[in-house]
């Protein structure tokens, strides 16, 4: 099994780990009583990356924009199941950005563009320049981005996800993960999917037909497949074609967002890894 080992560009799914850090260390405060758990958690993640990749030279953290995106226009219920950012987390955003700037780590937020789309577009942009990319995220949407040169570091499971691992676990190619999510939906992002189609059925259909388009081109064949409740599944697909195609558009990460980032912009300063927690200690005691 081959995975990226030497000097990759690290792209961190900042918003995902910002929330995870906030809830993991929600009671942590500095000496002035200001909340700092999210900051601590993010810096801890970065520090662990420095320890894992001792010769790390290129890193960038991508954050979501607060503005609505094209997906909200396509589907007004998109991510509507999520609550607004807690005030105690909002208070930590600006200090975190200031600390990351002092450390020398580039951050990027593009107004009106989701972090997933920025990560996808930047990854493919850098891949075209001959770079190897390691995306730090445990968001399953990211699996569609995996190529020979783009891997996912799943921090929760402490493993690197390659095309081979996706094929072994799901039996589908990374790019087919979009169709998979479109069929079964994604409760996390409120992507509807097709009613009554779960993981096993979605994987069966993708294995058989590869994508949504081929499924609907062969819709009359589905009722005869060796699949439990095949006739009902065929009916569900017919009755929910627009919903399936909408879900595909919602699940598909954009790869063509223009991003004005040069490789030199994300190269670390030599002092960076030694500086990480010293700067945090200064904030903690302020």
Swiss-Prot record:
UniProt xrefs under CDD domains: H3TH_53EXO (cd09898), PIN_53EXO (cd09859)
Key words of the record: DNA-binding, Exonuclease, Hydrolase, Nuclease
One GO term of the biological process aspect: DNA replication, Okazaki fragment processing
GO molecular function, one term: 5'-3' exonuclease activity
InterPro entries per record: 5-3_exonucl_a-hlix_arch_N, 5-3_exonuclease, 5-3_exonuclease_C_sf, DNA_polI_H3TH, FEN, HhH2, PIN-like_dom_sf
Positions of the 5'-3' exonuclease domain: 172-270
UniProt-listed Enzyme Commission number(s): 3.1.11.-
Any Pfam family the entry gives: 5_3_exonuc_N
UniProt enzyme class: hydrolase
Role of this protein: 5'-3' exonuclease acting preferentially on double-stranded DNA.
Protein name: 5'-3' exonuclease
UniProt organism field: Buchnera aphidicola subsp. Acyrthosiphon pisum (strain APS)
């Amino acid at each position: 099994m081959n995975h990226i080992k030497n000097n990759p560009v690290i792209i961190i799914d900042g918003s995902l780990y910002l929330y995870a850090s906030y809830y993991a260390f929600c009671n942590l405060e500095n000496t002035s009583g200001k909340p700092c758990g999210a900051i601590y958690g993010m810096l801890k993640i970065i520090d662990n990356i420095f320890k894992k990749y001792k010769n790390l030279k290129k890193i960038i953290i991508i954050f979501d924009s607060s503005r609505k995106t094209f997906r909200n226009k396509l589907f007004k219920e998109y991510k509507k199941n999520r609550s607004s950012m807690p005030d105690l987390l909002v208070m930590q955003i600006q200090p975190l950005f200031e600390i990351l700037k002092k450390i020398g780590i580039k951050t990027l937020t593009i107004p009106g563009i989701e972090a997933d789309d920025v990560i996808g577009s930047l990854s493919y942009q850098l891949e075209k320049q001959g770079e190897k990319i390691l995306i730090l995220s445990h968001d399953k949407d990211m699996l569609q981005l995996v190529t020979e040169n783009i891997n996912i570091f799943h921090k929760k499971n402490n493993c690197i996800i390659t095309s081979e691992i996706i094929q072994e676990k799901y039996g589908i190619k990374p790019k087919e993960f979009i169709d998979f999510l479109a069929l079964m939906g994604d409760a996390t992002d409120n992507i509807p999917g097709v009613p009554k189609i779960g993981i096993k059925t979605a994987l069966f259909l993708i294995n058989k037909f590869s994508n949504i388009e081929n499924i609907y081109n062969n819709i009359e064949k589905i009722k005869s497949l060796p699949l439990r409740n095949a006739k009902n599944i065929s009916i569900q697909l017919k009755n929910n074609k627009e919903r399936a195609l909408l879900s595909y558009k919602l699940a598909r990460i954009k790869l063509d967002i223009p991003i004005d980032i040069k490789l030199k912009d994300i190269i670390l300063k030599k002092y960076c890894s030694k500086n990480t927690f010293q700067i945090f200690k200064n904030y903690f005691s302020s």
